[in-house]
Amino acid sequence: MSEQSCQMSELRLLLLGKCRSGKSATGNAILGKHVFKSKFSDQTVIKMCQRESWVLRERKVVVIDTPDLFSSIACAEDKQRNIQHCLELSAPSLHALLLVIAIGHFTREDEETAKGIQQVFGAEARRHIIIVFTRKDDLGDDLLQDFIEKNKPLKQLVQDYEGRYCIFNNKTNSKDEQITQVLELLRKVESLVNTNGGPYHVNFKTEGSRFQDCVNEAASQEGDKPQGPRERQLQSTGPEQNPGTSELTVLLVGKRGAGKSAAGNSILGRQAFQTGFSEQSVTQSFLSESRSWRKKKVSIIDAPDISSLKNIDSEVRKHICTGPHAFLLVTPLGFYTKNDEAVLSTIQNNFGEKFFEYMIILLTRKEDLGDQDLDTFLRNSNKALYGLIQKCKNRYSAFNYRATGEEEQRQADELLEKIESMVHQNGNKHCVFREKETLNIVLVGRSGTGKSATGNSILGSLVFTSRLRAQPVTKTSQSGRRTWDGQEVVVVDTPSFNQMLDVEKDPSRLEEEVKRCLSCCEKGDTFFVLVFQLGRFTEEDKTAVAKLEAIFGADFTKYAIMLFTRKEDLGAGNLEDFMKNSDNKALRRIFKKCGRRVCAFNNKETGQAQETQVKALLTKVNDLRKESGWSGYPHTQENVSKLIKNVQEMSQAEKLLKNLIGILQ
């Protein structure tokens, strides 16, 4: 009775949630002062539990901030230490457990947190939980209820907690909004305490024992859950696994200077590949050497930096026509960069997304770690590298190049065991080359901007008729093709869909032309290049873009790149400054819709200068292709039918409008 009656004079709140959910910022908002460390970071900001309090309207409010207590990558010792500290700070009771979730970022980690709360605090705790959503500002004009309805796992979680939730904007500068959201939360807490007949009583011994059981269970099942890299990798290194194939083919990949050749020599147990420190790449071509290991033939293929090669597929096929059993990405500890990611992108472009299932990461220069723990270093150093390790299911090894004798042999054996295990898990199959798909580039825009000349520049030959005329030169869609950097490229030149002279006489011509445009595209990914003339953005350009959106859908710009012709008119200026300083709102709006993707052509260029600007465009297209999940504008039969319906409805509307204007005149 005394505990319940004191709830009017004191409220104790426990913040729970995954890393970066906004717990600390929420705690600061509740207390009305900055007491918990809060900043955006890819690593955990809060390392230990912290208790702070403040008197708000004659009521003491106690807030306990916590690190991510239920993270699947945290070690068991840290979990146990933090949960014990949390329980000590929470005693004797809590008026509410606040589960903090960031709007738009509900993930499996949040579900793990909810499950962890029940495991540690027991089923009774569910009756005392309130969900606090953060990042209210990200909702914009949308309703929180609508957002919850659209996310089934989140909707189920809200139902599990009987619809108890509120939302915070921790970025607001409005004092009224700050106090309003805090008071709303505290009213919900008071109501919850009254409904439950009192607060949640913390039994340190019971909860601590329950958590220890949870830790023990996790430790016994670490093969089924994502643990730290070392724990995860140990389960697949046993030498007694099914021997499977009698040969292992390993392709060494990595940026220039990563130490691929030295790694190959360590695996082979002899100096087979040339090594040396040089500003230039020591390995200029693919080289293959082999050794016998546990009655298997192990072929090691040393490769130059494949991100700089034009025809990687033909080069690799000379040595392994079917593809390798394993990719070994060699990268020095502490030096994982964008150059490594360029190598991965090249592999993905040639082998597809599945190549991650065939990759192991070899970290060299382990000797530079000194006394540091490798797992700790990986967790706390490079986010991109750690993410890659997780994507590869924690398959990695580390080499100490100062190792000799038995130690050198041991680290080579451990790596080969991992490779053997991975190959066995992949059914002893090779990672086969990705089926080459054509890249379709559709040139669109008003007439007179230089679409045909741009098409000829991309193709490197005079395929499309291009000359200065008062009337549109291109009457119908046509295509040309070339091979660029081993990639088949089809360029489709189109008429201006809003300036077709014969459409007025025969409205069906527009429908026919859209069909023809799409039929020129071959099997593969399709992207648009919106062509404008530098310094001459007109009302016709605006109309042309509006027409394209009406035909291909409002989101077609997601698959589009802006291209300005007459680059020579820039003189000593650059395109970035031109766009930045443009006072044309319509042009800037299109630029934003196209994701700020833009380039410029001088269609009078020839030779290497012409190829340089073509490379710049196709690089942007392939970057966009990668961003869009290796898929372009959908021209499936279903989508084509939808487009034709759009065209028919648009033609009918234009016809009615024309008749109406005629009547009014």
UniProtKB/Swiss-Prot annotation:
A GO BP term here is: regulation of T cell apoptotic process
G3: annotated span: 65-68
Give me the stretches of Polar residues compositional bias: 234-246
MF GO annotations: GTP binding
Where does the record place a coiled coil?
400-427, 608-657
Q: Where is this region: G2?
A: 44-48
Domain AIG1-type G: residue ranges: 8-210, 245-435, 436-644
Location in the cell: Endoplasmic reticulum; Golgi apparatus; Mitochondrion; Cytoplasm, Cytosol
Region described as G5: 169-171
> Which UniProt key words apply to this protein?
Coiled coil, Cytoplasm, Endoplasmic reticulum, Golgi apparatus, GTP-binding, Mitochondrion, Nucleotide-binding, Repeat
Q: Does the keyword rRNA-binding apply?
A: no
Q: Which GO terms describe its cellular component?
A: cytosol; endoplasmic reticulum; Golgi apparatus; mitochondrion
Q: Which residues bind GTP?
A: 17-25, 38, 135-137, 170
**Per the record, which residues fall in region Disordered?**
217-246
Tissue-specific expression: Expressed in the spleen, intestine, liver, and colon, as well as in lung, placenta, kidney, muscle, and heart. Extremely low expression, if any, in brain, in thymus, bone marrow, and blood leukocytes. Detected in T-cells.
Region G4: list its residue ranges: 134-137
Give the residue ranges for region: G1.
17-24
Q: Where on the tree of life does the source sit, at the highest rank?
A: Eukaryota
- Name the residue ranges with Basic and acidic residues bias: 222-233
Q: Sum up the protein's function in the record's words.
A: Exerts an anti-apoptotic effect in the immune system and is involved in responses to infections.
Q: Which family does it belong to?
A: Belongs to the TRAFAC class TrmE-Era-EngA-EngB-Septin-like GTPase superfamily. AIG1/Toc34/Toc159-like paraseptin GTPase family. IAN subfamily.
User: What's the protein name?
Assistant: GTPase IMAP family member 8
**Source species:** Homo sapiens
